[in-house]
């Protein structure tokens, strides 16, 4: 269950073409000429790591990839919190356990929802609901659990990566916060 960047954009183009067609059919031939806003629903789980050149390091791994069993089990024990196979933190830790060479080059990690948002607004953010598909959220801070972030960083410290978990995750936003504007 992996997809290329090209497949993502092809899928979005198909969705927009379908939207245009439906509007034309439903509203007596009216064509969409411009949009004031648009919403895109996408997966809140999965694994999309990018390097400092903003290039994807491995094909997009969806929430349907179930090769993260060991990582999910170990993280659930470490965090004393159930970490599902599909969460981004499970995918990241499984890549570490597998000694995947790309991990050392990660500068940004997101989900499909975060990737599409970043590409259409330039902002590396996630709404709090989608962010909870990456790592548990602390309801007191409305941010990733600082305790779990610290435990994860300590767990992988022997690997000596040049990043900390908090530095590679999208910023968490609550409902109503400005998440950016569509780029031209």
Question: What function would you assign to each model-found segment?
Answer:
Residues 1, 76-81:
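Short glycine/proline- and acidic residue-enriched helix-loop micro-motifs
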Residues 23, 27, 75-76, 95, ...:
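Hydrophobic alpha-helix position signal
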């Amino acid at each position: 269950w992996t997809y290329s960047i090209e497949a993502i954009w092809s899928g979005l183009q198909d969705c927009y073409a379908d939207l245009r067609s439906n509007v034309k059919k439903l509203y007596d031939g009216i064509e969409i000429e411009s949009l004031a806003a648009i919403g895109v629903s996408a997966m809140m789980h999965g694994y999309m790591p990018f390097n400092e050149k903003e290039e994807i390091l491995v094909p997009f791994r969806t929430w349907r990839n179930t090769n993260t069993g060991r990582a999910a089990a170990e993280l659930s024990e470490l965090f004393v919190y159930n970490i599902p196979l599909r969460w981004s933190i499970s995918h990241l830790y499984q890549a570490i356990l597998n000694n995947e060479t790309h991990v050392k080059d990660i500068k940004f990690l997101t989900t499909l929802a975060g990737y599409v948002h970043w590409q259409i607004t330039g902002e590396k953010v996630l709404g709090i609901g989608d962010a909870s598909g990456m790592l548990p959220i602390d309801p007191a801070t409305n941010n990733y659990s600082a305790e779990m972030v610290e435990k994860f960083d300590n767990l992988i410290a022997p690997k000596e990566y040049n990043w900390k978990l908090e530095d590679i995750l999208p910023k968490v936003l609550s409902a109503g916060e400005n998440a950016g504007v569509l780029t031209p």
